Structure formats: structure tokens, C-alpha cells
């Protein structure tokens, strides 16, 4: 039997581990802690599991909520989205959180957390010039992110994995 606060504490630990200093480096003072605190409080029980469209609407709202929580003027959409995607990926990978909140049911919809290393890996597979120039995390917009996510989905399908897992392959390829 686990104490009542076990899942809350575990979610906080996963949030702080997933969204580390290197994840949001250079995004502004206070962005790291605000992102960690926000992710530690995401209501994982409310993640929509009925459709990809509902999940995407939820994810967009969470990104907006995190942007509002950031303590800086120029709020970087890309950094907020990356933080949430990192957290959701690590929550999926955590046995307890994944089981408790049935996160495997949204595995196929989770986004790959975008950054320059992931984009470099994606671009190495872009033989048709489908991908735009990487604007950097600070200047990443939802529309540009979507182009990278669609391309990542195609690459993941070729590997027989969900898009969120492609991050591991691309990260290792860049080492």
C-alpha cells in the first residue's frame, strides 16, 4: 500500500526530471521552475483518451496555460510545448503514472519533444526538402511545430514505433 501523496510526489519527481536545465536553457529567467511546477500539476487523469483530435485540443490548451504561467514577457511557445512533451513522454515511461492514468492509450498521439538535436536528426532523413528551416525553440510556432510533428510521424511509422519514441533514436544518432 502506498501513501496518499505517493502519486503526487512521483508526478513532481518525474516533472522535475523530465524538464531539466538543458531542456529550456536560454529561454528566460524562471522558465525552468515555472515549467517544472506546471508539469507537476497537470491533471493526468483528465488527459483525453477518446480521440487524437481531443488530445490535440487538450495539449494546445495546456501549452497556453503554461505560457500564461511563465514569468517573462516574451513567452516562448516552443519551450512551453517542449516541456510538456518531455513530461508526458517521461510520465508514459513511468510504470506507476502510466498505469494509474492509462497513458498507453494516448501513446500514439504524444508528440516528439522538439529541439535542435531532434530537428537535426529529422533533417538527416528529409531527402525531399519537406522540412522548414529550424527557427530555434524561442521562435518556434505552432504551425512550424506541426510540420515537424507530421514528418516525425512518418519517420516513426517507418520504424514501427510511436512518434514520441523517435526521440531516443534521433538523440542517439546525434551522439
Question: Model-flagged regions — what are they?
Answer:
Residues 1-17, 21, 26, 72-81, ...:
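C-terminal accessory module of base-excision DNA glycosylases/AP lyases that mediates lesion recognition
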Residues 1-74:
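Phosphate/adenylate-binding glycine loop and adjacent helical scaffold
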Amino acid at each position: 500500500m502506498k501513501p496518499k501523496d505517493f502519486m503526487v510526489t512521483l508526478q513532481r519527481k518525474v516533472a522535475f526530471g523530465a524538464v531539466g536545465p538543458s531542456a529550456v536553457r536560454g529561454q528566460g529567467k524562471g522558465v525552468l521552475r515555472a515549467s517544472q511546477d506546471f508539469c507537476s500539476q497537470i491533471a493526468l487523469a483528465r488527459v483525453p483518451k477518446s480521440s487524437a483530435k481531443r488530445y490535440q485540443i487538450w495539449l494546445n490548451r495546456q501549452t497556453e496555460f503554461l505560457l500564461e504561467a511563465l514569468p517573462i514577457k516574451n513567452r516562448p511557445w516552443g519551450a512551453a510545448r517542449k516541456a510538456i512533451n518531455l513530461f508526458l513522454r517521461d510520465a508514459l515511461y513511468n510504470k506507476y503514472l502510466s498505469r494509474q492514468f492509462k497513458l498507453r492509450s494516448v501513446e500514439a498521439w504524444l508528440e516528439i519533444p522538439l529541439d535542435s538535436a531532434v530537428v537535426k536528426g529529422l533533417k538527416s532523413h528529409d531527402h525531399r526538402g519537406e522540412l522548414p528551416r529550424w527557427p530555434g525553440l524561442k521562435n518556434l510556432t505552432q504551425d512550424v511545430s506541426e510540420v515537424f510533428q507530421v514528418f516525425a510521424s512518418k519517420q516513426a511509422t517507418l520504424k514501427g514505433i510511436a512518434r514520441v519514441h523517435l526521440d531516443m533514436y534521433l538523440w542517439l544518432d546525434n551522439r
